[in-house]
Swiss-Prot record:
Domain of life: Bacteria
Family per record: Belongs to the YciB family.
The gene coding this protein: yciB
Pfam family, one: IspA
Job of this protein: Plays a role in cell envelope biogenesis, maintenance of cell envelope integrity and membrane homeostasis.
Keywords: Cell inner membrane, Cell membrane, Membrane, Transmembrane, Transmembrane helix
Compartments (UniProt record): Cell inner membrane
Chief place where the protein resides: membrane
Species of origin: Shewanella halifaxensis (strain HAW-EB4)
Database matches in HAMAP family: YciB (MF_00189)
Lineage per the UniProt record: Bacteria, Pseudomonadati, Pseudomonadota, Gammaproteobacteria, Alteromonadales
PANTHER family assigned to the protein according to its UniProt record, in alphabetical order: INNER MEMBRANE-SPANNING PROTEIN YCIB, INTRACELLULAR SEPTATION PROTEIN A-RELATED
Name by which UniProt lists this protein: Inner membrane-spanning protein YciB
Transmembrane segments: 10-30, 50-70, 72-92, 118-138, 148-168
InterPro entries reported for this sequence: YciB
Length: 181
């Protein structure tokens, strides 16, 4: 249920874009992200920081897109969110308080050097995705960008997540692996 809730705004954005245009889809994205927060709070009695940050970014860049009737803003949002994620992960690692370890370290017990590699891997991933987003958003058609944003970046993120879990699992002790099964 939680994963479906995470994809709700993206699904609504894509569906509305296909029937209308980028501006109606941007408005729908703002509404869907707000709805995501409400449902998340109702179900889990808390709001995740990532959802709050995403809501603020979607609201700011979606509103600018609507008010100025310029799709550049909603396109830049993707890159800026990825940049913020990369910065947050990188800074947390430099300060020896890795975010990924704090989020997953209780379930996935591996050495700190493994968490460091995973963190820098994700920093690199977010930087590359942000740069590729800029290229696709401003060099190719709007429809290509929407498809890339919805399917390409989502697929890349899912693949990256699976690779990360496999890498972490590979670096766990045999005993810790058995506890997860």
């Amino acid at each position: 249920m939680k994963q479906l809730l995470d994809f709700l705004p993206l699904i609504i954005f894509f569906a509305v874009y296909k029937f209308f245009d980028i501006y109606v889809a941007s408005g729908a994205l703002i509404a869907a992200t707000a709805l995501q927060l409400v449902i998340s709070y109702m179900l889990y009695k808390k709001l995740e920081k990532m959802h709050l940050i995403t809501f603020v970014m979607v609201t700011v860049f979606g509103s600018l897109t609507l008010i100025l009737h310029d799709d550049s803003f909603i396109k830049w949002k993707v890159t800026i969110v990825y940049a913020l994620f990369a910065i947050a992960l990188g800074v947390s690692q430099i300060m020896n308080k890795p975010l990924l370890k704090s989020m997953l370290g209780k379930e996935l017990i591996v050495e700190d050097k493994v968490w460091a590699r995973v963190t820098w891997y994700w920093v690199s991933f977010f930087v590359v995705c942000g740069l590729v987003n800029i290229y696709v958003a401003f060099s190719l058609s709007q429809e290509t960008w929407v498809n890339f944003k919805v399917f390409g970046l989502t697929a890349l993120t899912l693949i990256n997540t699976v690779l990360t879990v496999l890498y972490l699992f590979k670096n766990m002790s045999e005993e810790d692996r058995k506890e997860l099964k």
